[in-house]
From Swiss-Prot:
GO (cellular component) term, any one: plasma membrane
Membrane topology field: Single-pass membrane protein
Known role: F(1)F(0) ATP synthase produces ATP from ADP in the presence of a proton or sodium gradient. F-type ATPases consist of two structural domains, F(1) containing the extramembraneous catalytic core and F(0) containing the membrane proton channel, linked together by a central stalk and a peripheral stalk. During catalysis, ATP synthesis in the catalytic domain of F(1) is coupled via a rotary mechanism of the central stalk subunits to proton translocation. Component of the F(0) channel, it forms part of the peripheral stalk, linking F(1) to F(0).
PANTHER family linked: ATP SYNTHASE SUBUNIT B (PTHR33445:SF1), ATP SYNTHASE SUBUNIT B', CHLOROPLASTIC (PTHR33445)
Protein's name according to its UniProt entry: ATP synthase subunit b
Coiled-coil intervals: none
HAMAP family in alphabetical order: ATP_synth_b_bprime
Oligomeric and partner information: F-type ATPases have 2 components, F(1) - the catalytic core - and F(0) - the membrane proton channel. F(1) has five subunits: alpha(3), beta(3), gamma(1), delta(1), epsilon(1). F(0) has three main subunits: a(1), b(2) and c(10-14). The alpha and beta chains form an alternating ring which encloses part of the gamma chain. F(1) is attached to F(0) by a central stalk formed by the gamma and epsilon chains, while a peripheral stalk is formed by the delta and b chains.
């Protein structure tokens, strides 16, 4: 061993001195620095744990919020589909009601027009009968009042008809 120390040119006394200084420094470090350093390390460890727990909590909250938003979106899509379906159904019912009313009104108009045409026809026939009767009476009166030959009667009827056309 002395050979080693001789090679390093260290004396046993110097070595003991260095060991004592080193031990004293270790005691001083342990007494003054080790406590605050370990306290700082423990605080840092607690902060890291707290941050990790907070991050996990935030992640769970975000996941829950995302699930809630997804469910709300799904519900709103379902509601929109239902509203659209109801609107289409109502529009179809309204269309059918309008068409039905239009058909009924058209049938009523056709019926009234048919009745009006029948009434106009009846009125025209009645008026024509009345006119024919009046013409016949007028012709008969003229024929009776004059003693006319057949040719004169024909001329008289023709003149009377011409007078009606004018």
């Amino acid at each position: 061993m002395q050979f080693m120390f001789a090679a390093l040119k260290l004396e046993l006394g110097d070595t003991l001195y260095y060991l004592l200084i080193f031990a004293a420094l270790l005691l001083l470090v342990k007494h003054f620095a080790w406590g605050p350093v370990t306290k700082m390390m423990e605080e840092r460890r607690q902060k890291v744990i707290s941050d990790l727990d907070q991050a996990e909590s935030d992640r769970k909250k975000a996941e829950l919020l995302a699930n809630q938003r997804e469910a709300a979106l799904k519900d709103s899509k379902q509601e929109a589909t239902q509203i659209l379906s109801t609107a289409k159904s109502n529009a179809e019912k309204t269309k059918n009601n309008i068409i039905s009313q239009a058909d009924q009104e058209a049938a009523a108009i056709r019926k009234r027009a048919s009745e009006d045409a029948a009434q106009a026809k009846t009125d025209a026939l009645n008026e024509a009968r009345d006119q024919v009767a009046d013409i016949s009476v007028a012709i008969a009166e003229k024929v009776i009042s004059k003693n006319l030959s057949a040719a004169d009667q024909k001329d008289l009827v023709d003149q009377f008809i011409k007078g009606l056309n004018d």
